[in-house]
Amino acid sequence: MQYDPKAIEQKWQNEWKEKNAFEPQENYSKEKMYVLSMFPYPSGRIHMGHVRNYTIGDAIARYYRKTGANVLHPIGWDAFGMPAENAAIKHKVHPKKWTYENIDYMRKELDALGLSFSHDREFATCDPLYSKWEQSFIIDMWNRGLLYRKKAAVNWCPHDKTVLANEQVIEGRCWRCDTEVVQKEIEQYFLKITDYAQELLEDLKKLEGNWPNQVIAMQRNWIGRSEGLEFRLHFDETSAKKAGIDGFEVFTTRPDTIYGVTYTALAPEHPVVKHLIETKQLSDEAVQKICTMQNQNARTRQQAEKEGLFLDLYVIHPLTKQKIPVWVANFVLAEYGSGAVMAVPAHDERDFEFAHKYNLPIKYIIKPKEGELDTTKAYTEPGILFDSGEFSGFESSEAKQKIIEYFEENGIGKRSVNYKLKDWLVSRQRYWGTPIPLIKCPKCGIVPEKKENLPVTLPEDVEITGEGNPLELHPTWKKTTCPKCGGEAERETDTLDTFVESSWYFLRYTTPRKYWEEVPFRKEDTDYWMPVDQYIGGIEHAILHLLYARFFTKVLRDLGYVNLDEPFKRLLTQGMVLKDGAKMSKSKGNTVDPDEIVAKFGADTARLFILFAAPPAKELEWSDSAVEGAYRFIKRFFERSQNAYKTKSLPKIDQKSLSKEEKEARKKVYEALQKSTDVYTKSFSFNTLIAASMEALNALNGQNNPDIWTEGYWVLTNILEPIIPHTCWEISHNLFERNNFTRLQLDPAALEEDSVTLAVTVNGKRRAEIEVPKDASKEEILAKAKEIAKKWIDGKTIVKEIVVPGRLVNIVVKG
């Protein structure tokens, strides 16, 4: 019987497609399982990272189907984004055409892997019907005040000519094209994710144990909650006139260090700095230096050498009443706190570095509880206050509270909570995205489009050159009438950040296609299917997508669309696929084409290798020889199935009548079955299950009992079906009419040991081991132990004989 993967795989893929084999039931009384791998961007070809992501999800989905669960395992396309525009420029093809052609090709590639997707619920986020509901949500958020517009310094990518969210700037560079990002001030739209900062933080506790600790820690750090003191520093009289205001707010998490303040520092974008520039109170050289700082993004600034400029302004210390110089510094960020810091160089490394560079005073006011204070560096740990007025002698923790209380009692400050998390900048100056459904009217201001006019669709007659925003340049598209007054108006020409689309796509899947024109999703569907039971994707999405999706879910809950707080119950973050120790990439020339692997070895080989080579959460090193090894195992597994016979039910086997080798073979088979439940539902260590199945097949070799072979294949095709489905469907169809594709029961007798191994010790020292029947008597055990320990007990008097059942025999001798 020859193994022909091409014929077998084509046969079953055709059958699955014809029978819509993987569509979920609309039977909401059944136990459900929602398995979702993060949907792909339709770049044109799948890569090995896709193969890994979707094979993991497919294995889990197939397992739960066999247990009788109602499984939702959908696929779709994260279809908007800059690569389509870049392709339009490079290949002179419309983004829409490029995108949908890529989707068609990639769908065939994924289907060729035998992935059990619900294609009836498939969509692309660039479909107008998807945009319609997204725009409806955006209008709701605008009306609620959750979407707003303001002028802001934003991250600008000079190459892509668009704005980037903070999360899309990686080490000072654009996350897509790697161009250095600069700062630019323009009118932008923001979603008020900060309104949900505390809930996003607190609800991370609900995910503990089900999400990787690393992802939870990354989100917690990104949200960045800190408690401290907020107070106003007032200018002296001369400085107030120059600055145009009486002072500015500062926030500190270390109020215990307030007596050590020797200067204050403002962000280059601070209103005071702006006022000095606009009123021409700074030299051209100073303005140029500040502009250079402003053009650097936050990460570049913080990593760069500390730079500053004295503004010839002074504020009054709120407690000592001393004059404190005011500087502008590149390490102060406008978006954190108030954009101003009280600098305590003695107790902050960053402030210390800056003070040393510019020869500013350093005043120590906290010392360690034990040991000497080292004044050659900043002492940043808690300690005992000194030279701090009435707060001297207190420990840092107590001093913090007392100083906050003093400020509050005297009306000069207050306890405050700050977050590093900033509002989500969602507008992009690009063509290929969801149009923002707002209209600019000269009389009425910004007005949302009427919902009955949705979706606002993109014009197709555009020329994409890479310069500016094609919607802004279009001669007619933006011209419209105001929904409020009926007068002439213009459409908003910005489009939405593509992370908006991926913030709710998992909800769309819950509702069958036939309802999509009427609703974004039905509540009865989300009540049943949500949250996603198992979500699978790369850890690179820990902050970006996963935080936004959590936020969006909470907003949609508050808008009345859903009844849940968190979208993803469990999260598995798979590792990257490497070749020659590096991440696969075209630029490195180390990619492997999945299509070629499938054509040469078959989809089941690709699936088996990808799940066997490493645990899902770890990086996977590509190995041609391991791929060949996976193929050989499947071929052997298929061809040896002829040793089993056809049956519609599991053979009845009398354990007592079997030989030792037959018992061992059964034991290996049932050990693999025992392991499978944990692997498919908790640990996802598919490599260990595959190894156990290989051991079981090896144990079956050499057996002549057809019952043992048949039972072995009944179990093994069940266990391996989620991993190598085509091969297992073919074997099971031929032998068992697929009656074994159900939840199998363990046979406890098969796992029982006939014998036990006992350690033999003489006077407590281990000398040997014996194997005895499980039900051996004490006398039989001692006889065998004495025989093997003969040379250590001969000629000596046995004083005591101890048998510890299942563990050891100890013989005590003297003489």
From Swiss-Prot:
Subcellular localization, as worded in the UniProt entry: Cytoplasm
Highest taxon of source: Bacteria
GO cellular component terms attached to this protein's record: cytosol
CDD domains: LeuRS_core (cd00812)
Record's keyword annotation contains Transferase: no
Reactions accelerated catalytically: tRNA(Leu) + L-leucine + ATP = L-leucyl-tRNA(Leu) + AMP + diphosphate
GO BP, sorted A to Z: leucyl-tRNA aminoacylation
Enzyme class: ligase
Chief location bin: cytoplasm
Molecular-function annotations in GO: aminoacyl-tRNA deacylase activity; ATP binding; leucine-tRNA ligase activity
Motif extent ('HIGH' region): 40-50
EC number: 6.1.1.4
Motif annotated as 'KMSKS' region, chain positions: 583-587
Residues holding ATP: K586
Keywords: Aminoacyl-tRNA synthetase, ATP-binding, Cytoplasm, Ligase, Nucleotide-binding, Protein biosynthesis
Family: Belongs to the class-I aminoacyl-tRNA synthetase family.
HAMAP family in UniProt: Leu_tRNA_synth_B
The protein's name: Leucine--tRNA ligase
Recorded name of the encoding gene: leuS
